[in-house]
Amino acid sequence: MENEESGKSFVVQWNNSEGGLSEGPLSVLWSLIESYKVDIFDVSLSRITRDFLSFLRISETLSLELSAEYALMAANLIYLKSKALLPDPGFEEEDYEPPLPPELVEKLLEHKKFQLTAKKLSEMDQTQTGVFRRESNVTLDEEDNWLDVSLLDLISAFHEILESQSVEAEIPTLLTAPHRFTVEEKMEKILFTLREKKEISFPELFEREKPEKAEIVATFLALLELSKQRILRAKQHKLFGEIRLFLVEGHWNGTEQQSKD
């Protein structure tokens, strides 16, 4: 009974795209860890599994989709716990409490980092809520006369991509997905594409069937890094129109030589 009551304080909620409230299993796990007031590497796998299952028992408002996510996480925790508690002939300590496995710790730390990044982007976006934009009918006639794109425009376009229905749900691979996407690899891919096509639209960076959120974030960070290094420029031919990406003049030969080495 004590566990069920204490479990009510472990609910973590945020606004979803439909305006309602959502809860995620990784956020609940992180909230549990914070309530223990110990280092994440010292958290008992048995304890967090027990408390997570207790949380599920008292949760009555989960949607069908979220229930499936929680059920999968619960199954993963139970599997990891049973695996960790298998008898080890070389280890005889009776009170041994297995810690969280490295793969779960890694996912939790990634999740927290992503949450902090999303919060920062949201705060930056909210600073623009008092600014009313008018759709501009002014198109720049000269082909080479483009408007520079601001960071806030890029962030807005990034949010649209993240909220797209084509983004793949990552729940089935919460604990098993390896690091398949790095910023460095995405930088190379963007440069290769621009060398071939000369210019591309912002959405073209993410044109893969059901891209994962991790891939989208890595691609966006690669875009920002290339822009920071003045290798790439983001422009639009119409105020608040489609964002297009170009290589800065002077980097064509350098990038081509690097690709040949």
Swiss-Prot record:
Keywords: Cell cycle, Cell division, Chromosome partition, Cytoplasm. GO terms for biological process: cell division; chromosome segregation; DNA replication. InterPro entries: ScpA, ScpA-like_C. GO terms for cellular component: cytoplasm. Disulfide bonds: none annotated. It is found in: Cytoplasm. Belongs to the ScpA family. Participates in chromosomal partition during cell division. May act via the formation of a condensin-like complex containing Smc and ScpB that pull DNA away from mid-cell into both cell halves. Component of a cohesin-like complex composed of ScpA, ScpB and the Smc homodimer, in which ScpA and ScpB bind to the head domain of Smc. The presence of the three proteins is required for the association of the complex with DNA. This is Segregation and condensation protein A. The gene is scpA.
